[in-house]
Design a protein with these regions (language model features):
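Non-transmembrane, aqueous-exposed alpha-helical and coiled segments at domain scale
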Residues: 1-83, 87-103
């Protein structure tokens, strides 16, 4: 099977996000890379399925995925911005989420 670099990156992101989901289910707090992976994967999946078609709505959704109690101490302060290119029904857009982990 031959994958493009973008496809390989997407698989790696999904894998990290799945690990993060499993850890959250067990009550384990997420570290920085796990939190980034989970937020990005959720945004990419919602954009792909078209359930959140507006960019501004997706930016708001990105800030609801994780809360402060879901991540290790200090992760919320380190994560000021998350950006990911997502494929929407009308094309690729850069989704920017400011302060993605809220109280």
């Amino acid at each position: 099977m031959h994958l493009t670099v973008r496809e390989e990156e997407r698989i790696q992101l999904w894998s990290a996000a799945e690990m993060a989901r499993r850890r959250l289910e067990r009550g384990v707090k997420l570290n920085y890379p796990e939190a980034i992976a989970l937020i990005c994967d959720e945004i990419l999946e919602r954009a792909r399925e078209g359930s959140i078609p507006m960019l501004t709505d997706m930016m708001e959704y990105g800030a609801t995925i994780l809360k402060k109690h879901d991540v290790m101490e200090g992760v919320q302060q380190m994560m000021k911005i998350v950006q990911v290119e997502a494929m929407f029904p009308d094309g690729t857009k850069l989704v920017t989420v400011m302060n993605p982990i809220r109280d």
